[in-house]
């Protein structure tokens, strides 16, 4: 038996110990795994172990066969979630939106959780769901108009295509660090930009180190870190690698020590790299990978290629573990190491699990989805939430309520209601009159990650984008940043009074609760024949669950009057007036100073606040009651948390 350390060390009657810690070649289990005798070989049935799996077992035994024991009788595990709760959780966690009625019905016919996970991992919306996370981590910070501090190019399109293609993370990092392609039209060269920054590559160095190595070097920008072991020299060596040439430390990137010492007290910080010092490109993280990793670089004369090789080399277990920890934290609500971006501050709560996940990540070809599949299929992920927990249990006995990303909340509201995500172009120069360096068109959004800050130096009403701003206001209330001057790995998830207020009274709330002709709930109300079934379908559509008895009773009472006559006969519907052929007036940078531009924009803002007209296909009184129900359901706390 191998389900306990005692049994493994005891072994069988003839073979001796199945495992001899520190000596894989003396362990009976390894002898059986490597045996050519079909009567002795392990496993006796099925596929034999792969070379990588054998190597993993050999390493584990040679490293001592560490077998941590937990007092299981002191632990209380929550049961697995019910099927519908699991379905909503896994949909939002993988593709950022809840399942449709059709997807729910298909799952109820065949409630195979593994199959659903496999299907979702091939869904193109996987990329949409991860975009906001990597925009934060990599500080993607484009500005529609004139660049300000630490603006980047919009490398979002390369990032989006990389996620759509499920690009292996070692390739992903290599392409990002090469910074080739278009600076202003979506390529990774946009990552190289840090406008109004005296040493752009030092800024990029802090991003790269936290994102892929869990090394926090922000303090080392101007002085040696007082709380970490990293020196300013280390950061500037990394910056020189990213810049492919030596870098001189500017005066603006150093703390004036004469002023710090002026008070007479010994300062907490030290400056060991003087302004004007020239720093050569050099790998500063020998503890993660040695010089032999540089041989993997495609171009040994390109320090960016060398840096990418050093970070992604198989011997660099830190890169694999940091990335695996990020994926784990995204799905589980907390990392095995916290904070995920600063491994000097945090230590693994489960070091063996962390090592195993890192090695699985490498073995799987640095494939994010391969690791996601392992986590999503685990019982730890699929357990029921304990609503009394503020944070997930360190032993993962139960998930805690997990606040969704702002993009997940907004995208889920639009997807579940069936209301089209309709905004202006993310651009203030729609007639393309300005240079690309001073004006960027980021296209027509279909998901909320595609938005960016609408602020600009002019701050004039004519340069407002009212529909984008309405969505951005909701996103901002839930922790989204329109401007990302610095990288972050975890957003502020604390509740605030603005969150319920902006959903219940804001412009987006009007759009979602107004039953217009293009609203999904309007279509549902027109096709259902039974009120009982309609209420069930409404709850499934919006909340991926059936109503409770109390909810069913309350909503039946509210909607029963007039349900039978809710549909207005087509002959009684007044036809809409024919559209005018007058050309719609537009506002762009080229005409925003005209007085009429402000008038046009203010009219657009009023129209945005008003929303689309209500449908004439439903009786007005009954439609108003259904809109009340819709308002109540869309303001339920369930929209903000993973179930």
Residue ranges and their predicted role:
Residues 11-18:
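Acyl-group handling in specialized metabolite and lipid biosynthesis
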Residues 45-69, 161, 301-304:
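C-terminal capping alpha-helices of c-type cytochrome domains
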Residues 294-323, 327-331:
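Structured secondary-structure scaffolds
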Residues 19-25, 45-59, 258, 271:
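Periplasmic c-type cytochrome electron-transfer domains
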Residues 2, 37, 55-58, 70-281, ...:
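Short, structured secondary-structure elements
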């Amino acid at each position: 038996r191998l389900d306990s350390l005692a049994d493994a060390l005891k072994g069988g009657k003839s073979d001796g110990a199945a495992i001899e810690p520190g000596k894989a070649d003396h362990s009976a289990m390894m002898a059986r795994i490597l045996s050519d005798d079909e009567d002795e070989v392990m496993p006796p049935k099925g596929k034999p172990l792969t070379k990588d799996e054998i190597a993993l077992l050999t390493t584990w035994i040679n490293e001592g066969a560490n077998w941590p024991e937990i007092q299981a009788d002191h632990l209380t595990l929550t049961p697995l979630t019910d099927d519908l709760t699991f379905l909503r959780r896994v949909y939002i966690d993988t593709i950022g939106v809840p399942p449709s009625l059709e997807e729910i019905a298909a799952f109820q016919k065949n409630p195979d959780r593994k199959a659903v996970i496999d299907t979702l991992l091939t869904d193109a919306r996987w990329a949409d769901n991860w975009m906001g996370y990597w925009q934060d981590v990599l500080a993607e910070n484009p500005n529609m108009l004139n660049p300000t501090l630490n603006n980047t190019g919009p490398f979002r399109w390369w990032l989006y295509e990389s996620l759509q293609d499920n690009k292996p993370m070692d390739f992903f990092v290599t392409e990002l660090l090469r910074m080739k392609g278009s600076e202003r039209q979506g390529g990774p060269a946009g990552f190289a930009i840090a406008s109004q920054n005296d040493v752009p590559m030092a800024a990029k160095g802090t991003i790269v180190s936290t994102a892929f190595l869990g090394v926090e070097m922000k303090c080392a920008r101007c002085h040696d870190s007082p709380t970490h072991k990293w020196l300013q020299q280390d950061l500037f060596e990394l910056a020189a690698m990213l810049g492919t040439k030596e870098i001189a430390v500017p005066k603006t990137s150093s703390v004036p020590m004469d002023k710090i010492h002026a008070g007479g007290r010994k300062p907490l910080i030290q400056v060991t790299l003087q302004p004007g010092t020239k720093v050569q490109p050099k790998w500063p993280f020998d503890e993660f990978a040695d010089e032999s990793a540089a041989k993997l670089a495609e171009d040994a004369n390109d320090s960016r290629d060398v840096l990418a090789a050093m970070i992604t080399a198989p011997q660099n277990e830190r890169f694999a573990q940091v990335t695996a920890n990020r994926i784990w934290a995204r799905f589980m609500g907390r990392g095995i190491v916290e904070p995920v971006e600063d491994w000097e501050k945090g230590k693994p709560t489960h070091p063996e699990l962390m090592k195993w996940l890192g090695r699985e990540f490498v073995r799987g070809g640095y494939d994010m989805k391969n690791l996601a599949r392992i986590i999503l299929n685990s019982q730890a992920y699929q357990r029921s939430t304990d609503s009394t927990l503020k944070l997930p249990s360190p032993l993962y006995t139960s998930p805690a309520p997990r606040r969704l990303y702002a993009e997940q909340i907004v995208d889920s509201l639009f997807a579940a209601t069936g209301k089209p995500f309709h905004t202006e172009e993310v651009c203030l120069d729609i007639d393309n009159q300005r240079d690309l360096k001073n004006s960027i068109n980021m296209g027509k959004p279909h998901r909320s990650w595609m938005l960016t800050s609408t602020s600009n130096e002019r701050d004039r009403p004519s340069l407002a984008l009212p529909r984008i701003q309405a969505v951005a206001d909701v996103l901002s209330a839930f922790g989204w940043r329109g401007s990302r001057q610095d990288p972050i790995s975890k957003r502020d998830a604390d509740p605030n009074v603005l969150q319920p207020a902006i959903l219940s009274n804001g412009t987006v709330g009007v759009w979602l609760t107004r039953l217009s002709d293009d609203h999904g709930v309007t279509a549902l109300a027109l096709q259902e024949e039974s009120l009982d079934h309609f209420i069930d379908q409404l709850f499934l559509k919006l909340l991926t669950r059936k109503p409770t008895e109390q909810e069913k009773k309350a909503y039946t009472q509210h909607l029963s009057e007039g349900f039978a006559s809710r549909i207005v006969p087509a002959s009684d519907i007044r036809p809409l007036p024919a559209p005018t052929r007058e050309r719609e007036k537009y506002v762009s940078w080229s005409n925003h100073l005209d007085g009429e531009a402000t008038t046009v924009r203010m009219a657009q803002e009023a129209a945005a606040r008003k929303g689309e007209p209500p449908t004439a296909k439903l009786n007005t009184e009954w439609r108003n009651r259904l809109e009340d129900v819709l308002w109540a359901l869309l303001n339920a706390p369930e929209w903000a948390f993973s179930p």
